[in-house]
């Protein structure tokens, strides 16, 4: 694919141009993008004209920084690409839990059956979210099913938000209790089967989760 000034803007961002002013030369940038120094000069002028960068000349080269408008442009581009590539998709790695999932799934099992329509395997599959950044980012546009809390033997169990998902054609749900000890990078998944055994998963395996 033919290079453009967008490639240059991304290169400047990766070089630290968002956080600080960076010193570079057209020759150095031309080698990195495999274009002529004259092309780099023209692209820098175009980016400056569009308000995406600020630049000034020094004896050692060109000082460049990405403007606030440039940062907003890159953020918007990132959002649009993410939406196009990963719409409804969560990428994560299987991790071990602390062993409490089975207890809580058993307590909520009748309500899971009522609200989600399946008898859950007594345990959860824990997944560390790689993309998007957190489980909350992944589910922000998905409507949850609220499993109501209850009291049992003097103990209170809070509401749980459940989000229907599919992993390798097995339907289940990501569950987020109103009280949780897990960081926002961890997704707890319930299903009618033992997902680890059924899908032959081990810690570190990467999986793709589709929201429904």
Swiss-Prot record:
Region named H-T-H motif-like: 1-87
Substrates-to-products reaction catalysed: riboflavin + CTP = CDP + FMN + H(+)
Keyword Magnesium belongs to the record: yes
Biological process per Gene Ontology, one example term: riboflavin biosynthetic process
Gene3D superfamilies: Riboflavin kinase-like (2.40.30.30), Winged helix-like DNA-binding domain superfamily/Winged helix DNA-binding domain (1.10.10.10)
Annotated binding of Mg(2+), by residue: 124, 126
Pathway assignment: Cofactor biosynthesis; FMN biosynthesis; FMN from riboflavin (CTP route): step 1/1
Cofactor note as given: Binds 1 Mg(2+) ion per subunit.
Its EC number(s): 2.7.1.161
Entry binding sites for FMN: 180, 188
Gene Ontology molecular function: DNA-binding transcription factor activity; magnesium ion binding; nucleotide binding; riboflavin kinase activity
Enzyme class: transferase
The organism's place on the tree of life at top rank: Archaea
The keyword Flavoprotein is assigned to this record: yes
Residues that hold CDP according to the record: 97-102, 193-196
Region (Riboflavin kinase), start-end ranges: 88-212
Cofactor: Mg(2+)
Keywords noted in UniProt: Flavoprotein, FMN, Kinase, Magnesium, Metal-binding, Nucleotide-binding, Transferase
Similarity comment: Belongs to the archaeal riboflavin kinase family.
Function comment: Catalyzes the CTP-dependent phosphorylation of riboflavin (vitamin B2) to form flavin mononucleotide (FMN).
Protein name per its UniProtKB record: Riboflavin kinase
Species for this entry: Pyrococcus furiosus (strain ATCC 43587 / DSM 3638 / JCM 8422 / Vc1)
Gene: ribK
């Amino acid at each position: 694919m033919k290079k453009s000034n967008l490639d240059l803007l991304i290169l400047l961002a990766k070089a630290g141009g968002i956080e600080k002013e960076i010193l570079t030369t057209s020759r150095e940038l031309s080698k990195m993008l495999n274009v002529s120094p004259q092309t780099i000069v023209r692209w820098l002028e175009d980016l400056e004209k569009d308000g995406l960068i600020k630049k000034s000349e020094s004896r050692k080269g060109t000082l460049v920084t990405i403007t606030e408008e440039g940062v907003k442009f890159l953020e918007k581009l990132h959002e649009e690409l993410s939406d196009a590539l990963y719409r409804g998709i969560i990428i994560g790695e299987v991790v071990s839990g602390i062993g409490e999932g089975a207890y809580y799934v058993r307590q909520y099992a009748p309500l899971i059956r009522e609200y989600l329509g399946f008898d859950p395997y007594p345990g959860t599959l824990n997944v560390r979210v790689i993309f998007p950044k957190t489980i909350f980012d992944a589910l922000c546009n998905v409507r949850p099913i609220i499993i109501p809390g209850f009291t049992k033997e003097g103990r209170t169990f809070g509401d749980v938000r459940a989000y229907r998902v599919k992993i390798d054609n097995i339907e289940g749900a990501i569950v987020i209790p109103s009280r949780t000890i897990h960081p926002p990078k961890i997704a707890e998944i319930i299903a009618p089967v033992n997902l680890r055994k059924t899908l032959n998963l081990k810690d570190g395996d990467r999986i793709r989760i589709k929201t429904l």
